[in-house]
């Protein structure tokens, strides 16, 4: 008697993926400077991801900062290897910037392989204790000088859009190397404040926020953040449905938190393995305990769900997308 053993296709794929990654290195690219909240998360992810990938490859973190994350996003789309050994942390605004065909964008967010995000977030605008901005009304009546880490980042996009849509008076100063340097500029009194990830600010300057050295004057996202009761919520500032839809599209990027991607054209079985590794890592008790010790909120979204959400975002009416794109576009050279 001859016994034929049939190995399921998924088993063969798992074995092939393990053979590929075993003894290899995975390059994890950080798209922001080393002092930023993105990079803190990237280093943290780099400590745990390899143990959840088949073959347990070493994960090496390298930085490719600049232009609010666009340099890394463009690299991942056009130049990164397609074998699954290069992945990256991108700016949460990356999907929206692609859909808006923003200046400097040379990637298609619908073709990138989204792997997951450890957290969904909100954006808050903060000012230093001595800034002349005390209330929401002051944002309309007084110039508020805010710093950013580049025109491709939310630190730039949100105040610019708010100026156009609801007539705040933010003066935006671009060109700081990363969000950590922006915070130092607030400390030195060079600028009044910044509009930045709530998680980043709570992690880096939670004591200052609690003491009032940094004051939260506005919050934005898909819903109010319960950590900031009584702070004005950006969607409530909309004066009509068109403004509300535009603000909702712009702030939808907060949902993506700290997104991780692989390039297009990576073999599907390796994309699946990378996505599963992120999902397993987000459930890892050691990972969760370590995150809690460092005051990181873990509220993950899977790569599959991110892909679905970005597809839904792409269905936003084109006039709304075009309006938001026009709001955040840099001025034409004279």
Task: Explain the meaning of each model-derived region.
Residues 22-24, 212, 217, 266-334:
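An extracytoplasmic/periplasmic, membrane-proximal ligand-sensing/linker region
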Residues 127, 229, 262, 282-283:
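A conserved hydrophobic position in a structured secondary element of the catalytic/binding core
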Residues 1-8:
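Bacterial N-terminal signal peptides
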Residues 4, 14-15, 243, 281, ...:
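Generic detection of intrinsically disordered/low-complexity segments and helix-coil linkers/edges
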Residues 257-263:
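A short beta-strand structural signal in non-transmembrane regions
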Residues 9-13:
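Cleavable N-terminal signal peptides
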Residues 33-34, 263-268:
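Structural beta->alpha junctions
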Residues 14, 18-257, 329-333:
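Conserved hydrophobic/amphipathic secondary-structure segments
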């Amino acid at each position: 008697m001859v016994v034929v053993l049939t190995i399921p296709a998924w088993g063969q794929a798992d074995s092939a993926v393990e053979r590929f990654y075993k003894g290899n290195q995975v390059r994890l690219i950080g798209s922001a400077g080393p002092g930023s909240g993105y990079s803190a998360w990237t280093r943290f992810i780099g400590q745990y991801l390899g143990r959840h990938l088949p073959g347990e490859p070493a994960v090496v973190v390298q930085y490719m900062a600049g232009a609010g994350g666009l340099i890394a996003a463009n690299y991942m789309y056009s130049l990164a290897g397609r074998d699954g050994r290069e992945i990256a942390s991108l700016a949460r605004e990356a999907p929206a910037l692609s859909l808006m065909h923003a200046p400097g964008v040379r990637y298609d967010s619908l073709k990138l392989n989204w792997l997951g995000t450890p957290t969904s977030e909100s954006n808050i605008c903060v000012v230093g204790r001595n800034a002349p901005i005390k209330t929401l009304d002051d944002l309309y009546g007084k110039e508020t000088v805010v710093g950013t880490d580049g025109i491709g980042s939310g630190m730039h996009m949100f105040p610019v859009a708010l100026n156009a849509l609801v007539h705040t008076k933010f003066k935006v100063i671009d060109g700081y190397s990363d969000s950590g340097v922006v915070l130092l500029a607030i400390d030195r009194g060079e600028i009044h404040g910044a509009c930045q990830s709530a998680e980043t600010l709570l992690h880096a300057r939670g004591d200052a926020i609690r003491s009032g050295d940094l004051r939260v004057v506005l919050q934005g996202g898909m819903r109010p953040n319960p950590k900031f009761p009584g702070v004005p919520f950006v969607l409530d500032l909309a004066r009509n449905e068109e403004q509300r839809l535009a603000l909702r599209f712009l702030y939808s990027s907060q949902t993506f938190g700290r997104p991780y991607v692989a390039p297009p054209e990576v073999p599907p079985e390796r994309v699946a393995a990378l996505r599963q590794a992120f999902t397993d890592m987000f459930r890892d008790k050691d990972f969760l305990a370590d995150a809690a010790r460092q005051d990181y909120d873990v509220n993950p979204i899977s790569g599959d769900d991110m892909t679905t959400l970005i597809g839904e975002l792409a269905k936003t009416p084109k006039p709304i997308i075009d309006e938001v794109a026009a709001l955040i576009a840099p001025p034409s050279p004279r």
